[in-house]
Each structure stands twice: as structure tokens, then as C-alpha cells.
């Protein structure tokens, strides 16, 4: 089979197209024929490494945490999927050398494989994983919020999504709307505002406006209940100014820097909760619950992709995976997909 591998960290040129053997799944594993692979920032960050020359944990690595395809074989004890099922994958490559989705067949643990609803496309499935599960987690950690999402779970809540044109922001808007929240989102300009509006946000604001706090307070006079935050260092003062008493701020990225300063007394007085989250260490039970509720949203038609849904798709074939990584690393707006097989 054809696969993309890298044997050293570096820029996209370290990615190579090679032939690898198709392997059989062991106990608790599934072999999936990958149709579409989704590319996320975590993929290029792992490939580039934290520092020049950083050693890999394996001799070589197949990249790609997310994807969608068809189950080809199952190992002993697998009950959640069967041969022939259409599925989506999450965290496929985590702590595994050759389970990534940038290859024609992936063998991976069954608990990273989820049935894809009949009404959902492979493009939708490959666009879930990291973005949708991250968004789900961010929406279910509030002190006064739900632990699971379903229609009505966020009824009466005001959710502020920072960066509504990003992949996580897009999923957060759609999941929050499906769960009944009123959604405010902030973006950098008109083009991204159009995408966030298409995703379903009722209120789309430009975060560079000098009166952004007043604009948010006009929409939510008592403050927002939950914030899905992509840039905590950049937005900490804004978040403090608009969060309500007992509100929660879920941080999933470090856009704008790793260091932030908080006014402790003001956060005391508001009983603010900061929740930092990383999918790799969040726990299998959280991932499983997220997948169940994400599938319910998919079945309801609430998680859609494409420019008309606020998430433009950019496509390359497997041989040009380096181009896909370069697009994501360069900040392409939307979702970058790799067509792996038919």
C-alpha cells in the first residue's frame, strides 16, 4: 500500500511517499481503508518538532490523527464496529508509529474508531476528530454547564467562541447552536465573518474593534456563560471583561503566545473557572462520550462542512501530502483534506 512517512523532524519536505505492507489487526484493533484524511495543526507541529533536530519516538512515523473510511478487518474482541462499516477516526497516530491516516490502510485501536452516520459524508467524517472533539470538550467543562451535549443542553446559555472561522471554532459554533445556546463569535474581518455566519453564529463581531467589550455586553448584559478560547494570552483582558459570575473559559490553543497575566482578585470576585484541555490526555471516556454526541449532531444535520457551511475545503491527493501540511502550517482558512482512496 501507499503511505506517507517521515523519519526526521523538519519542514514538509521530510514527508515521503513509500510502499508499506498491509498488516492484520490484533486483538482490540481495527483495519480501516482510509478514504479521506484530515490535516490539523497538531500534525505539522509533530512533524516539525519542538526544536530543530528533535528525535522522533519511532524510526519513522505515518502522520494524520483524523480520517474517515471503511472497516476492512477487525481483531478479536472488537464489538463497536464491523467489517464494511463506514467510520471516522480520532487520534489515530497518537503514540503509534504507523497508525496515522496518511496511508491507504490504517490498523489502530478500536476505541479510536467510530461509526459514521449514514447521512454523513467521508469529508464530514475526516473533518471531525481533533476539531469536533476539542470543541465538544470545551463546551462541556463549565461549572454550571452540561457534561453531555444534546438539543436543549445549552438552552439559555450565551457562548462566546473566539476565532469562529477556524476548524475548532466552526465546530464549536455548530455544536453550541445544536445544543440550544446563543452564540457570539469574534473574527478578524469580513471574509471570516461571512464564514462564521454561515456556520450558524447569531452574532459575529470583529475582535479588533475598540468597543468590542461594549458590543458583547449589549448582546449579553449579564456576561457570557462560557468562552471557547483559542488565544488566551491575547484575549485574557477581553474575557475578564465579558465573563459572567461563575462563568467558564475553556482554553484549547496558545495562539498569541504561551504566557498570560491574570488579575487574581477580579477573577476571585467573579468565581471564574479556567479549564485547559488537550485531547491526547483527556481520557478515553471523554472521547467516547464526545463521539456519541457528535454522531447525534451529525445525524441531526448539525455538523456540516464546505464553504456554504462556513468551512471551506481544500483538497490534495496522498502523493501531495506535503502540500497539505504546508497549507495548514501557512494558516489556510477552512479544512485541508487528503484524498487517499476511492
Q: Model-derived features: where do they sit?
A:
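Glycine-rich beta-strand-centered segment in the early N-terminal region that forms part
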Residues: 21-39, 51-94
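Mid-domain Rossmann-like dinucleotide-binding core that forms the NAD(H)/NADP(H) cofactor-binding site
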Residues: 126-209
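Short amphipathic alpha-helix with an adjacent loop that forms part of the alpha/beta core around
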Residues: 211-221
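C-terminal hydrophobic helical "lid"/dimerization subdomain
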Residues: 288-342
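Glycine-rich phosphate-binding loop and adjacent beta-alpha segment
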Residues: 234-303, 340-342
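Short glycine-centered segments of the SAM/dcSAM-binding site in methyltransferase folds
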Residues: 86, 158, 182, 247-248, ...
